[in-house]
């Protein structure tokens, strides 16, 4: 299947410095975007973005929440 755009958004938990988390979330997004391309996902454009600890999906107060916040989200946009 071919997509117009694929957005790959990387996130971290709140542990560590802002600079470290920003760089880590970018590496995560870039790695997933590369994996998708290498495994045949076709798109006119790939966008990998770093969000660091912004927009947590769980509390960073507990280990389980921090684990959920260390994630990559993929959005596929049709033509």
Language-model segment annotations:
Residues 9-79:
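Periplasmic OmpA-like peptidoglycan-binding domain that tethers envelope proteins to the cell wall
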Residues 4:
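Short beta-strand/loop motifs in extracellular/secreted proteins, especially
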